[in-house]
Amino acid sequence: MKMDLTGKRALIAGGSRGIGLAIADAYAQAGADVSICARTEGPLREAEVALKKHGHKVLATPCDLGDANAIKQWVEASAKSLGGIDILVNNASGFGRTDDEAGWAVSVQIDLMATVRACHAAMPYLEARGGSILHISSISGLGASVRTPPYGAIKAALIEYTQTQALSYAGKKIRVNCIAPGSIFFEGGTWDIAKRDKPELYERILAGIPSGRFGIPEEIATVATFLASDLASWVTGQTIAVDGGPNL
């Protein structure tokens, strides 16, 4: 069986690096036209060049995902350019690194409300012919975590939101699922920085992964491609942990 997305139109919020870029790349390889957005122009342009090598349509748009109007404009412009929307991936995160007003505010706005707003903006297009919504949460949302409270709490909210949406939209032929990644290593990412600046934390987290290594973005992208494809046509409301087994 082949995970085929030929003819699909996919939007990936937070798609210029790491997990988001890996998902966009996997979707393009599977035949989809893709639209990505992120805050920073430089990585977006690099991602655009890489994605276009697969021969499908690629849009790369700077977007402040804390701005409700900017999200709506990105979704609507993407739908117009691609001819519709079949897949929406919400991957952006503010990371909520501090347990204070600022940390909670960024997690609520970027991890949660940007997701809600993108879903609202995309819904008319998804309802037109059915489709798939995918939220990227975290294993920090599945239980107690070394992360700060805002990050884990809002990632947990995404898991509940997935279930509620799946129940609400099943009759409209829209599937909603969630991936909870574990510790994912990529250049310039959280664990790349920790390896250099906080080696004790890096080694402690690594020691807690039964698989003996950090994951890579492509391992999340493989599951994301399955969930977006027709092979997962009867899968909805699920959160899949892709984590190497630390919670076993």
Give short role names for the model-derived ranges.
Residues A170, R175, V235-G237:
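Short, small/polar-rich loop/turn modules that mediate ligand/substrate recognition or access, typified
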Residues C119, I154, T162:
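Active-site helix of classical SDR
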Residues M1, V49, K53, G171, ...:
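A glycine/serine/threonine-rich, flexible loop-to-helix segment
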Residues S16-R17:
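Conserved glycine-rich cofactor-binding loop
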Residues P124, L167-S168, S233:
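Alpha-helical segment proximal to the catalytic Tyr-Lys
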Residues M1-T6, G143, A224-T225, T236-L248:
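Short C-terminal tail/terminal secondary-structure segment
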Residues S138:
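Residue(s) in the substrate-gating loop at a strand-loop-helix junction
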